[in-house]
């Protein structure tokens, strides 16, 4: 049988999602848990697939992975979570066809970037985002990673103000390495008035215009959702969701305390 999982993770606690030697990664921790439980022997023998790689510091709410196993009774969120570090949690599972590939079968991916909104003109960001919709060559918005083509399609970009923050949602069929974070950088520059839409149009024509721009910080980016055409009967584990929520409330409290401490360090009072 083949099982798919939805997992979430705090990206700042890992050196990316893809397994690497000598550093802690999301896949490294997941594979260790699955092996310890006897769910798989190895990723290769289980035909493991993942919806997409996230870089160090990037978070996920709904990363999707799939693998073959004959231990369906163990391949469920609360059992797997018992072997996972608190920075990762599985919260839904489903039986899927043996042919299901979490990456190739995905039709779109939804990312959200959160940043401070005090310095930006949201109307300029929204206007500029319209030029990015559709199919373009995003070579100027990526780090070279051996991709055969840098042409990608963006289906939707939404920018909105939420209190003192700006949230930018980007939905597309697939993304190049660092593409979303570089798009955020470009929109931020336009929102600050440092660049304009004429420059953005030039950036979308890499055959005649080349410019490297920095990626926005990884900690603001989350993979929110991966979409598939085929209907998958996901079973959510409310206990695992509730437990993760409790742990994240503790993280929120810690960050609030740290924010106050930093304010005191600035004020010298």
UniProtKB/Swiss-Prot annotation:
Keywords: Isomerase, tRNA processing. Its EC number is 5.4.99.12. InterPro entries: PsdUridine_synth_cat_dom_sf, PsdUridine_synth_TruA, PsdUridine_synth_TruA_a/b_dom, PsdUridine_synth_TruA_C, TruA/RsuA/RluB/E/F_N. One of its GO terms (biological process) is tRNA pseudouridine synthesis. The active site is at 55 (nucleophile). HAMAP family: TruA. This is tRNA pseudouridine synthase A. The lineage of its organism: Archaea, Methanobacteriati, Methanobacteriota, Stenosarchaea group, Methanomicrobia.
């Amino acid at each position: 049988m083949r099982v798919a999982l939805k997992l979430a993770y705090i990206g700042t606690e890992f050196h990316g999602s893809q397994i690497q030697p000598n550093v802690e990664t999301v896949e490294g921790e997941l594979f260790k848990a699955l092996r310890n439980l006897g769910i798989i022997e190895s990723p290769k023998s289980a035909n493991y697939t993942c919806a997409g790689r996230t870089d160090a510091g990037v978070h996920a709410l709904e990363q999707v992975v799939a693998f073959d196993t004959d231990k369906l009774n163990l391949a469920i969120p609360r059992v797997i979570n018992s072997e996972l570090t608190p920075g990762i949690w599985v919260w839904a599972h489903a039986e899927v066809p043996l042919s299901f590939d979490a990456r190739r079968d995905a039709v779109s991916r939804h990312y959200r970037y959160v940043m401070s909104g005090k310095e930006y003109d949201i109307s300029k960001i929204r206007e500029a985002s319209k030029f990015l919709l559709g199919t373009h060559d995003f070579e100027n918005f990526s780090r070279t990673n051996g991709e055969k083509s840098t042409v990608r399609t963006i289906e939707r970009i939404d920018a909105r103000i939420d209190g003192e923050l700006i949230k930018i949602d980007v939905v597309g069929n697939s993304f190049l390495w660092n593409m979303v974070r570089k798009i955020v950088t470009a929109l931020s520059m336009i929102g600050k008035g440092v660049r304009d839409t004429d420059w953005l149009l030039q950036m979308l024509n890499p055959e005649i215009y080349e410019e490297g721009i920095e990626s926005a910080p990884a900690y603001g980016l989350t993979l929110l959702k991966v979409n598939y055409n085929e209907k998958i009967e996901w079973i959510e584990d409310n206990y695992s969701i509730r437990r993760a929520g409790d742990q994240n409330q503790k993280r929120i409290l810690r960050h609030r305390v740290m924010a106050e401490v930093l304010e005191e360090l600035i004020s010298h009072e």
